[in-house]
Amino acid sequence: MLRTIAALALVLACANAVRAQDWPTRTVTMVVPFPAGGPIDVVARILAPPMSESLGQQIIIENIGGAGGSSGSLRVAKAAPDGYQFLLGNSGTHTYSQLLTKKPPYSAAADFAPVAVFVENSKVLTTRKDFPADTLPEFIAYAKANQAKMQFGSAGAGSATHMTCVLLNSAIGIDVTHVPYRGTGPAMQDMMGGRIDYICDVISTALPLIRGNSIKAIASLSPARSRVLSGLATAHEQGLTGFDADAWNAFFLPRGTPEPIVRRLAKATSDALDLAWVRERLEDLGLNVPPPERRTPDYLAKLVVSELEKWAAPVKASGVSTD
């Protein structure tokens, strides 16, 4: 009896291995856990065609919005680990969602098979145009002296813009009133109107207003300068040693997906990013394409864990919760 069970297990294992090597044999679904037409969706639609060509099967995009990206993420976490559904995740779905509630609907570290980071989105500290500081040291000095009367805005409680300012405030050592909005647009409008003092946003969103001289850019909040704002020094360069609030977007498969499928999808991602026209379109959006060594499943697995560790203390200290 035991020999029969062992033989059946071996047959099933061999069959699964063959299926993994043959993958994909039909259409693959990329789940984007945000509404169609948004900035993340735009990136997905840039990458899907060249990735489809690399895989030899069409990748279709399914937008499943809701719960800050958690609804679509949960769908993939519970999907069959056969490679035919994968998730476009990011800092929100795999970091903030885990820290802002006592009972996350899924585990970012345990419920997915990491595939590859495909873009890194630099962030920037922006202020109202008449804010009395032009550099980060000047901003810090003013904020420490005037924090009781200052306000910062965000796209909403628990949003990336909110969490980035939480991390920055913690690093500086200030306690400033948070004003949540329903989206970055209204927050920027109020900052331009002088009703709030600063916002920590992604460069791709803030860039038109910076170039139009409607707001001030004080510091890049990423490890390296942005290609599209190369003259703006990083927080690290301006004395906030080691500060890094980079956002990232990456692909994930369900936990238990065979390694050959994971590696194949990672290669398709990297192949797409190596195309000159893809890089150009992404960089024109203010996004950074990671080098090959940061496009691997192993790198992404470590990144998810390190990001959770980095953000845990500031989020806890802020008292922010979605419960």
Predicted regions and their residues:
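An extracytoplasmic/periplasmic, membrane-proximal ligand-sensing/linker region
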Residues: T25-T27, E259-D323
